[in-house]
UniProtKB/Swiss-Prot annotation:
Its cofactor is Mg(2+). The gene is glmM. This is Phosphoglucosamine mutase. InterPro entries: A-D-PHexomutase_a/b/a-I (IPR005844), A-D-PHexomutase_a/b/a-I/II/III (IPR016055), A-D-PHexomutase_a/b/a-II (IPR005845), A-D-PHexomutase_a/b/a-III (IPR005846), A-D-PHexomutase_C (IPR005843), A-D-PHexomutase_C_sf (IPR036900), A-D-PHexomutase_CS (IPR016066), Alpha-D-phosphohexomutase_SF (IPR005841). Mg(2+) binds at residues 100, 241, 243, 245.
Length: 449
């Protein structure tokens, strides 16, 4: 059995790879490992709007109850809400059934510990080992020792909306905002929060039917929102993904504003408020070099991690940083939540736009994005480190780096799932870096033939 858990829980095509049987086993093993020694543990269960959510929830909950835990089912709710509410309700763990930005046929199961953090690799391995060993040494409970399912009546959504609203001071009166809910988990929470803060709210893709989640909508397909913002003279647009742990924005001219710009704007604002701990933002190696240049001008440090919000969070926790995130719109505000939170991000951004008195596009001028080229080089899995070993490749990388002279960079990343290395170049001249990236990718491919 290979590793069951990926970077974001267990994911696969629902009813084919992620079966009801597997969901039952994950519920049983997860509840047993995460609540060992607790008399009558409570586990919070939420999901996004996918049609397969009901099937997987039934199976997952059966597994949880079989080891004597209580399952508190809160229904459709954003992933970051489960992270927050697990702490607020003093639950022993939280689980979300969602495949985030993936198409409808996929689903996933992701656990949070009692503090609202994603699980460590070690805990995930313990859950997998228990399943692999067919629940050896797990007692079979009967009678009154079996757990109960508790259907929650909407209080969880109310508590999460109140929490999200509390992260900004004042209201959003006078701001005209367009929201794209991706027909996903934010279709109630984000709309209500913005309305209650007195923004003028326009909404698209907020009618989930179980199969339209992420379909030509949300943060992965923001084209309709870009058009809508301009057509309706909105001050800004905000696009969520299926489980609302990420948010991208649209300025009043219809331009897509990615996570790098959001980090730059929010980082500068936190510094102004004296809340940017150690004067640092945490980004990944894939963040645009333009972000580093912009932050340097603001006398803000950038620290880089591997790609993945879990690595960003690790770095933030280790050194007590206030903000970090990815280009994709996973932004973590450690003062507020333990994971990327689309609604919290959207509210911070909207509040900054309102308070600044500037247009959103003016605020975005803080940063100039450098052209970026990404080329895949086909490389056998056992030779993915060739760029570190081969002298000619190393020499070519050094030459390119020298010629870019601080206003560009070379980044090579082996794919974790395919026989590829990704060659990424950034620089001021699109044509030049395009040629260099393709040349370097070709050199790498030729060396493994």
């Amino acid at each position: 059995m290979g590793r069951m858990f990926g970077t974001d829980g267990v994911r696969g095509v629902a009813n084919k790879e992620l079966t009801a049987d597997l969901a039952y086993k994950l519920g049983k093993a997860g509840a047993f490992i995460l609540t060992e020694g607790t008399h009558r543990p409570k586990i919070l269960v939420g999901m996004d709007t996918r049609i397969s959510g009901d099937m997987l929830e039934s199976a997952l909950v059966a597994g949880i109850l079989s080891v004597g835990a209580e399952a508190i089912c809160v229904g459709v709710i954003p992933t970051p809400a489960i992270a927050y509410l697990t702490r607020k309700y003093n639950a022993d763990a939280g689980v979300v059934i969602s495949a985030s930005h993936n198409p409808v046929e996929y689903n996933g199961i992701k656990f949070f510990n009692k503090n609202g953090y994603k699980l460590s690799d070690e805990l995930e391995d313990s859950i997998q080992a228990l399943i692999r060993d067919d629940f050896k040494d797990v007692p079979v409970l009967t009678g009154e020792n079996i757990g109960r399912k508790i259907e929650e009546d909407g209080e969880a959504i109310r508590d999460y909306i109140d929490f999200a609203k509390s992260t900004i001071k004042g209201d959003l009166k006078g701001l005209k905002v367009a929201l794209d809910c991706a027909n996903g988990a934010s279709y109630i929470t984000s709309v209500e929060a913005f309305k209650e803060l007195e923004a003028e709210v326009h909404v698209i893709n907020n009618k989930p039917d179980g199969i339209n989640i992420n379909r030509n909508s949300g943060s992965t397909h923001p084209e309709d929102l870009m058009e809508y913002v301009v057509k309706n003279n909105c001050h800004m647009g905000l696009a969520f993904d299926g489980d609302a742990d990420r948010c991208l924005a649209i300025d009043e001219k219809g331009n897509l504003i990615n996570g790098d710009f959001i980090l730059a704007i929010c980082g500068k604002e936190l510094k102004k408020q004296g809340r940017l701990k150690k004067n640092t933002i945490v980004v990944t190696v894939m963040s645009n070099l333009g972000l580093d240049i912009a932050m340097k001008k603001e006398e803000i440090n950038t620290i880089k991690t591997k790609v993945g919000d879990r690595y960003v969070l690790e770095e933030m926790l280790k050194n007590d940083y206030a903000i970090g995130g990815e280009q994709s719109g996973h932004i973590i505000f450690s003062d507020y939540n333990t994971t990327g939170d689309g609604l919290v991000t959207a509210l911070q951004l909207a509040h900054i736009v309102k308070e600044s008195g500037k247009t959103f596009s003016e605020l975005c001028s803080i940063m100039k994005e450098l052209p970026q080229v990404l080329v895949n080089a086909k490389v056998p899995n056992d030779q993915k480190d060739i760029y570190l070993k081969d002298e000619e490749i190393k020499s070519e990388i050094d030459t390119i780096t020298k010629n870019l002279d601080g206003s560009g960079r070379v980044l090579i990343r082996p794919s974790g799932t395919e026989p590829l290395v990704r060659v990424m170049l950034e620089g001021e001249n699109q044509k030049e870096i395009d040629k260099l990236a393709h040349g370097l990718a070709k050199l790498i491919e030729n060396k493994v033939k």
